[in-house]
Regions:
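Glycine-rich Rossmann NAD(P)(H)-binding loop
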Residues: 53-57, 86-93, 107-108, 115, ...
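Substrate-positioning beta->alpha
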Residues: 53-75, 84, 91, 95-98
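Hydrophobic "lid"/C-terminal helical patch
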Residues: 71, 75, 103, 173-178
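Glycine/proline-rich active-site loop of Rossmann-fold NAD(P)-dependent oxidoreductases
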Residues: 36-46, 74-85
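Amphipathic terminal alpha-helices
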Residues: 158, 166-260
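PAPS/PAP-binding and catalytic site of the sulfotransferase fold
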Residues: 95-107, 173
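Terminal hydrophobic/aromatic helix or amphipathic segment near a protein terminus
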Residues: 103-150, 184-213
C-alpha cells in the first residue's frame, strides 16, 4: 500500500464511484503539476535560486489552466469520457535543472537549481506556509519524483484529446507566474525574500511521523511507493516489474469528476 493516506483514500474513492450504477465516472490524475514548482518563483526572481529536492528526475508538469479545461470538457460531455482515466501533462519531460534554465530565460537572469535535502525542504515548506497535512503527503510525492515515477508514461496527449488544445509548455506557464507581484524586481521584494530565506534555517520542521501517529493514520508494515507497484504501472500503461503488486497513484491526489 502507498505510504500516503490521501493517495490510498483517493484510490478507494475511484473504485467506489466506478462500482455505483448510473454515474459517469471519470478520473483526472494530474500527478505533480507546474504550480508545485512555480510557488518558488519569488526565490528564482529575487535570489536566482530554484530549490527543489528532486535530483535529476524529470516530469512533464501540466498547468492549472489545462487541468481545469480538461475537467470542464469532461463535465460538458460525460458520456464521451465515462469510465476513462486521463493523465494531463505538459508537452515535454523536464528536470529541475531544465526548469531553472527556463526560469532564467523568463526572468532575464541566471537561475541555479539547488538540490536541497529533504530535511531542509520540509523546513522551507513550513516557512512558506505549507500545512503539516500537506507536507505529510508531499514528502511521499517527492520520493516518487526522485524515483522517476512522473517520467513513466509521460508526456501524454490527453489534454489535446479531451480539450482539442495543445498543453501549455513550462515556459508559457512560467511567464504567467513571472507577472505576479512577488516576482517583480524591487527592494521590498528582494528584502522580503531574503528574510524568508534566512528564516528557513531558524525554522523547525514538523515531526511528520509523530503527526501521522497522533492523527491515527494507519501504520503500514510494508509501505510501497507507486513506482514499485505493478498495479499502478499497469493503470498508467507502464511495463510491470517483478514483485508484489500494491496500489496507488503517484503525485497529487487525483480529481474525481462525477456527472449523473
Amino acid at each position: 500500500m502507498h505510504p500516503s493516506l490521501a493517495t490510498r483514500q483517493n484510490w478507494l474513492v475511484d473504485r467506489m464511484f466506478s462500482a455505483v450504477p448510473g454515474i459517469a465516472h471519470i478520473i483526472v490524475n494530474p500527478g505533480f503539476f507546474a504550480d508545485n514548482y512555480l510557488r518558488l518563483i519569488g526565490f528564482a526572481a529575487q535570489l536566482g535560486i530554484f530549490p527543489m529536492p528532486t535530483g535529476e528526475s524529470r516530469n512533464a508538469p501540466p498547468s492549472n489552466e489545462d487541468i481545469a479545461s480538461m475537467v470542464v470538457a469532461a463535465l460538458i460531455d460525460p458520456a464521451r469520457h465515462a469510465g476513462k482515466s486521463y493523465r494531463p501533462t505538459g508537452p515535454a519531460l523536464l528536470s529541475a535543472r531544465d526548469m531553472a534554465a527556463i526560469l532564467g530565460r523568463v526572468l532575464s537572469r541566471r537561475v541555479r537549481h539547488i538540490d536541497m535535502p529533504m530535511w531542509m525542504f520540509l523546513k522551507a515548506a513550513r516557512t512558506l506556509g505549507l500545512s503539516v497535512f500537506e507536507q505529510s503527503g508531499v514528502r511521499r510525492y517527492i520520493e516518487e519524483h526522485k524515483r522517476g515515477a512522473f517520467e513513466l508514461g509521460a508526456p501524454t496527449d490527453d489534454i489535446l484529446e479531451v480539450t482539442g488544445q495543445a498543453p501549455e509548455d513550462f515556459e508559457t506557464i512560467a511567464r504567467r507566474y513571472a507577472a505576479l507581484p512577488e516576482a517583480q524586481c524591487s527592494f521590498a521584494n528582494a528584502w522580503r525574500t531574503w528574510v524568508d530565506f534566512m528564516r528557513i534555517g531558524l525554522t523547525s520542521a514538523y515531526d511528520l511521523d509523530r503527526y501521522e501517529r497522533e492523527q491515527n493514520h494507519p501504520l503500514l508494515a510494508h509501505p510501497q511507493l507507486a513506482v514499485d507497484s505493478d498495479v499502478w504501472r499497469v493503470e498508467h500503461g507502464v511495463k510491470p516489474q517483478s514483485g508484489e503488486a500494491g496500489f496507488g497513484r503517484a503525485g497529487a491526489a487525483p480529481e474525481t469528476v462525477e456527472a449523473m
